[in-house]
């Protein structure tokens, strides 16, 4: 049993949505600090199995120290590589449920060295996997003003994106932009403070999404899930902003909607294009959870099952 640390968002709803079979095989695509993983394991029998992914080596190390369970397999990898990994394990079409929590974990936000937070000072990194790729500092240095503005707008809908990008480049003429509070202060001079929202929220979100290619990875794993899941297997995704949720919503709608066929055509059953999924709806965060955990206020859980 793990020490209580990370507060898993929409825990009860996600456990219900997975419709867990005691002897089933499940995937937690984003282990984090293991709150959801522990919940799944608690509902499995000795024959059940959980495969947990995380690209953050700190999460894997935490799991190895705090969650020793022979039903659990830990994979240090981005979930976008799920299909190839599950294929190698001989489990294609045998997974009874996939849970994807797209949020940044509390330890990641609270660890200044990770560079995710605009509230504590630290190196401007923002990589989920710090062993690979370009940090936020490196990208902001190499990108031009237009590229920065486009990323900030595309991944957060920040209306002041061009003004922010201009201020970033002006700052870099005389300074090395390398800490979180430096960036937060630049943005705060451009964006007005809103109730319950820091001025730099959208900018940090956009740069983090870009650095980690989060939307590209999400689109990839959603498509992969159609092959990975067993018949009636559940797909449950918790998103935290409208851009993510729109991708999930459209994917489920596209794959659960039967195409309209012209009347009178001589088509036999096996020629009709089948739908992959059944849309099981969405869940919103309860007021009680929001009161207890402000970070949960924007969470949406969407659920589908494989036909």
Curated annotation (Swiss-Prot):
The keyword S-adenosyl-L-methionine applies. It is found in: Cytoplasm. Keywords: Cytoplasm, Methyltransferase, rRNA processing, S-adenosyl-L-methionine, Transferase. Belongs to the methyltransferase superfamily. RsmH family. It comes from Vesicomyosocius okutanii subsp. Calyptogena okutanii (strain HA). It is an enzyme of class 2 (transferase). Specifically methylates the N4 position of cytidine in position 1402 (C1402) of 16S rRNA. Its main location: cytoplasm. It catalyses: cytidine(1402) in 16S rRNA + S-adenosyl-L-methionine = N(4)-methylcytidine(1402) in 16S rRNA + S-adenosyl-L-homocysteine + H(+). Its EC number is 2.1.1.199. GO terms for biological process: rRNA base methylation. This is Ribosomal RNA small subunit methyltransferase H. GO terms for cellular component: cytoplasm. The gene is rsmH. GO terms for molecular function: rRNA (cytosine-N4-)-methyltransferase activity. S-adenosyl-L-methionine binds at residues 34-36, 54, 79, 101, 108. PANTHER family: 12S RRNA N4-METHYLCYTIDINE METHYLTRANSFERASE, S-ADENOSYL-METHYLTRANSFERASE MRAW. It comes from the Bacteria.
């Amino acid at each position: 049993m793990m020490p209580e640390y990370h507060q898993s968002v929409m825990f009860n709803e996600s456990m219900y949505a997975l419709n867990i079979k005691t002897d089933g095989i499940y995937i937690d695509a984003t282990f984090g600090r293991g709150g959801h993983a522990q919940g799944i394991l608690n509902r499995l029998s000795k024959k059940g199995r959980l495969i947990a992914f995380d690209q953050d080596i700190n999460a894997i190390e935490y799991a190895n120290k705090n969650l020793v369970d022979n039903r659990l397999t830990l994979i240090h990898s981005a979930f976008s590589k799920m299909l190839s990994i599950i294929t190698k394990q001989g489990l294609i079409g045998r997974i009874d449920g996939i849970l994807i929590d797209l949020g940044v974990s509390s330890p990641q936000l609270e660890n200044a060295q990770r560079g995710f937070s605009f509230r504590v000072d630290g190196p401007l990194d923002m990589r989920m996997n710090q062993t690979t790729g370009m940090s936020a500092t490196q990208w902001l240095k190499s990108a031009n003003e237009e590229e920065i503005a486009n990323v900030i707008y595309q991944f957060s809908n920040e209306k002041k994106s061009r003004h922010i990008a201009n201020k970033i480049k002006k700052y870099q003429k005389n300074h090395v932009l390398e800490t979180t509070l430096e960036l937060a202060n630049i943005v705060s001079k451009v964006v007005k403070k809103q109730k319950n929202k820091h001025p730099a929220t959208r900018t940090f979100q956009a740069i983090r999404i870009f650095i980690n290619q989060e939307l590209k990875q999400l689109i990839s794993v959603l498509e992969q899930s159609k092959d990975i899941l067993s018949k009636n297997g559940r797909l449950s995704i918790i998103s935290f902003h409208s851009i993510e949720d729109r991708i999930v919503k459209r994917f489920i709608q596209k794959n659960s909607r039967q195409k309209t066929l012209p009347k009178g055509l001589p088509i036999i059953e096996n020629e009709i294009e089948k739908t992959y999924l059944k849309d099981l709806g969405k869940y919103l965060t309860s007021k009680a959870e929001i009161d207890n955990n402000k970070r949960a206020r924007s969470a949406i859980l969407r659920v589908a099952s494989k036909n």
